């Protein structure tokens, strides 16, 4: 089974994906980490993440070890990720990696921006998480503060809005829900509630007679 989860930054994709992978015994890939790794590599070399040549070269040389970098959760890597993700050459270089992961047994949960539309268009089930920029900014601030990092709400909100614009406005694989995705507005839902809805949706899709005992 392949589960695709898409949505804007800080919408709760990662939390839901990790919980579903654990619940159903599937592999999990945070595809955002791949783009963060590329962005971090470009920054480390002193290059501009918006430069197609530098970013594509970094994507083509990416290894699994790069996904273990300590700086991937930084805001600098996150901002760089959004910039490199808008470059067609980067997306092409990373597409095969993601598709190979998804096809590996026993199945996988992938979260990102274009999983249901580009990476795994034939995924068994797709979710698209929605949340206002203000709610997402508050969540991100709490996440950063919980990690002991300084975070200013206005700055985080501005960054999220800029990333939303880049993600939805890029010409290659723009952020948008797949036509067959289940859309979940998480503004008023906590992680547990979102997980419960997703599990029920999956079980109803694949085991319609489960509740009746058939």
Each model region followed by its residue ranges:
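P-loop (Walker A) phosphate-binding loop of NTP-binding proteins
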Residues: 8
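Hydrophobic positions on the alpha1 helix immediately C-terminal to the Walker A/P-loop
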Residues: 16
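ATP-dependent small-molecule kinase phosphotransfer cores
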Residues: 33-107, 117, 134-138, 142, ...
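Phosphate-binding beta-loop-alpha motif at adenosine-nucleotide cofactor sites
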Residues: 125, 176-191
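Conserved lysine of the Walker
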Residues: 13
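Hydrophobic anchor at the beta1->P-loop junction of P-loop NTPases
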Residues: 5
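Post-Walker A helix-loop "phosphate-sensing" segment adjacent to the P-loop in P-loop NTPases
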Residues: 21-31
